[in-house]
């Protein structure tokens, strides 16, 4: 079914546990299975949840209408079919995400950009509808097969928050290395470069300048061993690894300076940040989430990992195996839902991160981000093997409240006086 392709094949092929794929096999470098949870009434399918990872980027960023994209069209099509089957107006179809981090709804391979550029305007909506219809048809077909598995048993769940900027990695997930840690969230140059098909970023000349400026700042900081911030910078670059850092979101710094130091012409993201900064809307508040909700839900012998980020195909598979290993005696299947409970950027494997494609540049907490998720989710999964009254996990950590005074100033397009658009 022509519905999904890996958009970051070089990064994918860096993983030591995958079969290498060619440019003609990008459709095979993804998780091609869809997980489905159906709800039946009097033997008839009433509602369902689909878990399948593919970006909702059939529509480009030049359109000016809100749209549910492929996932929204999939839900609408499926609900229409359910209505006809059940004669009930309360059917619900949810098309949730799974390992969508490196998965595109657009073809990736030879002449990929030319093929994408032929889909413009109204054709983009039609493409999204077709992609969604494919997903809906596959889901409905699978759910109407008689050998679906009945889920029985109790429901259990644990949710806790973790400061992803300060996770010490279990050596098991750090190739045996000790004392590896995550760091404050940082956006790399590839974040601004965008993706090759789904969303092109800043012009190449600007990206080149960003690379040079970031490298120069790193050299300057690490050369100044007498600086009061030397140890801090040393730890930051050790954690962030090969990433050429543009934004240190935790410190509100852009290339080592205040957030509004770079002219708005460089990039739309920087332009918007400049507007909000000058309006006083983001001077103290966190730029991105740092304390993240982690959750596992257990329904009978099925467990669902609720993951806040955009996790790649292999990163998701490894995380599922980490959790499944801890729950092996009490569950038959472990599934994953991404973009869940919060949003915190991407989660790439250590190997994928070294490629520094868009996904690696947007893996905020450094090269051990995925290992941090494995470390914390392993601890969380272990709690399910303990009676509820004896469980012990972090129930105290919570995100800081957003500063109300700054929140009141935020708009889609602020200015320094009124923080509202002036036409």
What are these regions (language model features)?
Residues 1-423:
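Non-catalytic substrate/cofactor recognition surfaces at enzyme active-site rims
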């Amino acid at each position: 079914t022509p519905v999904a392709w890996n958009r970051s094949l070089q990064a994918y092929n860096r993983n030591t546990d995958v079969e290498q794929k060619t440019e003609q096999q990008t459709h095979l470098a993804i998780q091609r299975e869809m997980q489905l949870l159906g709800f039946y009434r009097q033997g008839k399918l009433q509602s369902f949840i689909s878990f399948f990872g593919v970006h909702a980027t059939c529509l480009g960023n030049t359109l000016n209408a809100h749209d549910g994209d492929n996932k929204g069209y999939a839900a609408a099509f499926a609900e229409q079919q359910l209505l006809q089957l059940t004669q009930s107006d309360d059917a619900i179809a949810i098309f949730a995400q799974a390992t969508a981090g490196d998965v595109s709804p657009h073809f990736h391979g030879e002449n990929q950009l030319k093929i994408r550029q032929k889909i413009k305007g109204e054709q983009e909506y039609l493409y999204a509808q077709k992609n969604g219809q494919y997903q809906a048809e596959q889901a409905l077909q699978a759910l109407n097969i008689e050998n679906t598995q009945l889920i029985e048993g109790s429901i259990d769940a644990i949710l806790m928050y973790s400061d992803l900027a300060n996770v010490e990695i279990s050596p098991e997930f750090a190739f045996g290395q000790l004392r590896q840690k995550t760091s404050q969230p940082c956006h790399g140059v590839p974040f601004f470069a965008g993706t090759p098909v789904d969303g092109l970023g800043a012009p190449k000349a600007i990206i080149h300048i960003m690379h040079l400026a970031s490298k120069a700042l790193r050299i300057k900081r690490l050369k100044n061993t007498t600086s009061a911030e030397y140890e801090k910078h040393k730890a930051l670059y050790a954690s962030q690894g090969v990433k050429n850092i543009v934004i240190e979101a935790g410190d509100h710094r852009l290339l080592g300076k205040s957030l509004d130091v770079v002219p708005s012409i460089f990039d739309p993201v920087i332009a918007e940040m400049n507007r909000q900064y000058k309006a006083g809307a983001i001077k103290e508040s966190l730029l991105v989430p740092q304390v993240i909700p982690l959750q596992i839900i257990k329904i009978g012998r099925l467990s669902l990992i609720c993951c806040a980020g955009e996790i790649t195909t292999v990163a998701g598979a490894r995380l599922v195996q980490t959790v499944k290993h801890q729950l092996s005696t009490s569950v038959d299947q472990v599934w994953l839902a991404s973009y869940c409970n919060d949003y915190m950027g991407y989660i790439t494997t250590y190997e994928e991160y070294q490629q520094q494609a868009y996904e690696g540049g947007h893996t905020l907490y450094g090269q051990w981000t995925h290992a941090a998720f494995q470390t914390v989710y392993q601890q969380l999964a272990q709690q399910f093997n303990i009676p509820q009254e004896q469980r012990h996990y972090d129930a105290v950590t919570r995100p800081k409240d957003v500063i109300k005074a700054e929140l009141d100033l935020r708009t889609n397009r602020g200015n320094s006086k009124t923080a509202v658009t002036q036409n």
